Amino acid sequence: MSFQKTILRKTWWGLEAKSYTEIAQELPSQDESLRKWIAIYAVYHLNFENRHPGESYYKFLENAKNSKYVIIEFTLPIHFLETRDSIGANDTTITKCKTMETEEEINSFLYENNINPELFTPPWTCEYPLD
């Protein structure tokens, strides 16, 4: 009998409790000039209605605002990380972007895409480049 792996409870509860807006992990890249990440955003924590003046969200978050979660997978040239003070979503190449409503949907997506859910962490522990 085999059990499907899930996101570690400590990490998931941190996302649900608003300790962080996203959890992420770095993935292996087939291209040595690129780094690759996957992140799960708790979109329902974001305030799309009453923002501070000038505050904006990444386009993938704006597009997902009617969903509870969004998963984004993207690559980023290593050269950008080495030469720029900040990184934006326009610097990335999005390879997957999918909205979801439940933890079960997320776990199924991760399983189908051979992504180990136990490796998700808060963004600062995996050098996640998007703020």
What is the role of each PLM region?
Residues 1-51:
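Negatively charged, low-complexity tracts enriched in Asp/Glu with abundant Ser/Thr
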Residues 4, 21, 59-61, 70, ...:
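Compositionally biased, low-structure terminal segments
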Residues 7-8, 15, 32, 36, ...:
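Alpha-helical structural elements
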Residues 18, 39-42, 55-56, 67, ...:
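Intrinsically disordered, low-complexity segments enriched in small/polar residues
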Residues 77-131:
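Mixed-charge, Lys/Arg-enriched low-complexity segments
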